[in-house]
Regions:
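Conserved HGGG/HGGXW glycine-rich cap/lid loop of the alpha/beta-hydrolase fold
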Residues: 8-73
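Conserved alpha/beta-hydrolase catalytic His-Asp/Glu region
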Residues: 160-206, 215
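Active-site loop/oxyanion-hole signature of alpha/beta-hydrolase fold enzymes
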Residues: 61-107, 270
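Flexible "cap/lid" loop of the alpha/beta hydrolase fold
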Residues: 125-158
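Short beta-strand/loop motif that positions the catalytic acidic residue
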Residues: 219, 225-227
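Short glycine-enriched nucleophile-adjacent loop
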Residues: 109-120, 126
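Conserved alpha/beta-hydrolase "acid-adjacent" motif
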Residues: 232-238
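Catalytic histidine-centered segment of alpha/beta-hydrolase-like enzymes
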Residues: 257-269
Length: 278
């Protein structure tokens, strides 16, 4: 379904009923909202990993952010983390969803962090997967070079400093295998609906200046951080800034896990499921 929010329609999909038979009664289960990674991709990868597991005991709500996937493209000036956070707030109001658990991974964690900073009481629990509060290009480049060699480091530097179609192509060729593992690159490119102009626009216009560190302490929801040690786009040092900035956040590190933590460390799925449904 599509829900209108401030000049755009957001694509939303559901898995699992909110009310479930429990003997002669109906039992209400938690609602969990998932915000995808990116920029420029959609929610579909999660329907093969965390989504089905969580939907066993909760109502799962998948959202494509404005400009992403099956949501309206909107206009480039709206492709900003603040707008996506505002959209999420309006979407929950339109759907009548009160204080859900919210999951955000990688790029999606930026939107979820901003949402949780602006409306601390609007969510019950927060799950962040490989979250960072700022881009930190030197760290990103250094980690790509460490894990993927000089070609990966050079491609990461070129795209973040001079984002365009050419440098994005080189980034995808050299860097995605390091981020995801070589076997996952083709599915990652073919399965989602990509908006590559958005990818370029966001990196060029907002990525270098965005910094959410100062307001991390505003987040009051119970928070679980799930982190892989080998995601070069979201380095350990940058993730640790989020861990240290959110009061009472707990963190679980998965050694050797890359960007797709759920695939590299399947045991993380159970941890997230137990956290959001308990």
């Amino acid at each position: 379904m599509r829900v209108a929010v401030d000049g755009a329609r957001l694509f939303v999909d559901f898995a699992g009923a909110k009310l479930r038979p429990d003997g002669p009664w109906l039992r209400e289960v938690p609602t969990v909202v998932l915000v995808h990674t990116g920029p420029g991709t959609d929610h579909t990868a999660y329907k093969e990993t965390i989504g089905p597991a969580v939907a066993e005991d909760a109502q799962m709500v998948y959202v494509d952010l404005r400009g992403h996937g099956r949501s309206d493209p909107s206009t480039p000036d709206t492709w900003r983390v603040g707008t996506w956070a505002d959209d999420l707030r309006v979407l929950l109001e339109r759907l009548g969803i009160e204080r859900p658990a919210v999951i955000g991974g990688g790029f999606g964690a930026l939107t979820v962090l901003r949402f949780a900073q602006r409306w601390p009481d609007a969510l019950s629990k927060l799950v962040l997967v490989n979250p960072v509060a700022r881009n930190g290009v030197p760290r990103v480049v250094a980690r790509f070079e460490e894990l993927g060699g000089a070609p990966a480091g050079e491609a990461a530097h070129a795209f973040h400093e001079h984002p365009d179609e050419h440098t994005l192509t080189q980034y995808m060729h050299q860097c995605l295998p390091v981020m995801l593992g070589p076997h996952y690159v083709v599915p990652a490119m073919l399965t989602p609906i990509w908006n590559l102009p958005l990818t370029i626009e966001w990196v060029r216009e907002e990525a270098s200046s965005l910094d959410l560190r100062d307001e991390l302490a505003r987040i009051s929801a119970e928070t679980l951080i799930v982190a892989g040690t080998d995601d070069p786009q979201y380095p350990v040092a940058s993730i640790e800034e989020v861990v240290e900035g959110i009061p009472h956040a707990s963190v679980r590190w998965y050694q050797g896990a890359r960007h797709a933590v759920y695939r590299d460390a399947p045991e993380s799925i159970r941890m997230v499921k137990d956290f959001v449904t308990r």
